């Protein structure tokens, strides 16, 4: 499943686009062979390792021979950051940045499905909480993510303590995004009620666009076979059979534009993407009305400009 050759090829293609600028690899902590994939990413030329879907407590050890590689955890609470910082400090490292992801993001969430809409888990409440914890350990940047749509959202979240922002769903709706045309069409045509929460074999709730896959899910589907053994919580397909789909197969199908069998992740605001635009136009839309200090922050190297997901 986790091919070094594939990782190297992905990075070669990414380098053609970003040149010598920082290139990050986003690696789920929940995958099997997590340590090997971190190793592969570094060998392939990653400047930054980003990790969510769990607490990557062992990450400093995995990069100890590569002090120039930045390590960036994704958290959904100040408590999670405290645990990470305490463990990493003992290993001689601290985060080079932290991504604070709220429950309006696309894909896997950091809290239980029944807790997603509680006030205490909303981005505007967890950013100050994470900042308070961050200040105890240093001044590494806080990158806010999850449901950020426009310049007003950027200003508000930075006033609450974020140093930068991360957007994903809006960039799917750009000409330059390498998502399939089918994926883009599904996003552009999605209505508000089409953005739904699904149970994932990863063990976390996920936010996706409702397609035929979601409509026809059958729990306890014993016909599902495990071919990749990709994530530990799934336990060789046991989790996939419980929820009714294989995460590896269905995400692969979405990448390849298979409308009926693909799992198309989207943030809560995905339905607001109603046409494709260029990345340049999107960036201009996001930063033009912002205050000067916010524009400067968005432009700094603290932003992870290019990310490979693995």
Predicted regions, residues:
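Short His-Asn-centered micro-motif
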Residues: 52, 145-146
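Conserved active-site-proximal phosphate/metal-binding subdomains
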Residues: 105-143, 149-310
């Amino acid at each position: 499943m986790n091919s070094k050759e594939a990782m190297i090829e992905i990075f070669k293609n990414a380098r053609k686009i970003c040149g010598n600028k920082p290139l990050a690899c986003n690696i789920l902590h929940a995958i099997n062979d997590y340590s090997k994939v971190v190793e592969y990413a570094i060998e392939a030329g990653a400047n930054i390792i980003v990790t969510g879907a769990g607490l990557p407590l062992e990450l400093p050890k995995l990069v100890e021979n590569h002090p120039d590689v930045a390590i960036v955890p994704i958290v959904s609470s100040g408590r999670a950051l405290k645990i990470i910082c305490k463990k990493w400090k003992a290993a001689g490292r601290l985060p080079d940045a932290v991504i604070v992801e709220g429950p309006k993001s696309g894909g896997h969430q950091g809290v239980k499905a029944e807790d997603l809409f509680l006030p205490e888990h909303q981005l505007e409440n967890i950013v100050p909480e994470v900042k308070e914890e961050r200040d105890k350990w240093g001044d590494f940047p806080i990158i806010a993510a999850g449901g950020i749509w426009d310049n007003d959202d950027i200003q508000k979240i930075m006033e609450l303590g974020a140093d930068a922002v991360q957007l994903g769903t809006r960039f799917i709706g750009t000409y330059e995004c390498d998502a399939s045309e089918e994926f883009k069409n599904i996003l552009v045509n999605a209505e508000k009620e089409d953005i739904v929460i699904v149970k994932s074999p990863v063990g976390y709730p996920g936010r996706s666009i409702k397609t035929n896959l979601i409509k026809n899910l059958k729990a306890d589907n014993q016909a599902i076979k495990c071919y990749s053994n990709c994530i530990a919580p799934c336990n060789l397909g046991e989790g996939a059979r419980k929820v009714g789909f294989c995460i590896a197969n269905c995400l692969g199908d979405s990448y390849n534009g298979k409308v009926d069998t693909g799992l198309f992740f989207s943030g809560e605001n995905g339905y607001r993407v109603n046409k494709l635009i260029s990345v340049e136009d999107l960036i201009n839309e996001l930063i033009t009305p912002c205050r000067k200090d916010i524009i400067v922050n968005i432009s700094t190297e603290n932003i992870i400009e290019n990310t490979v997901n693995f």
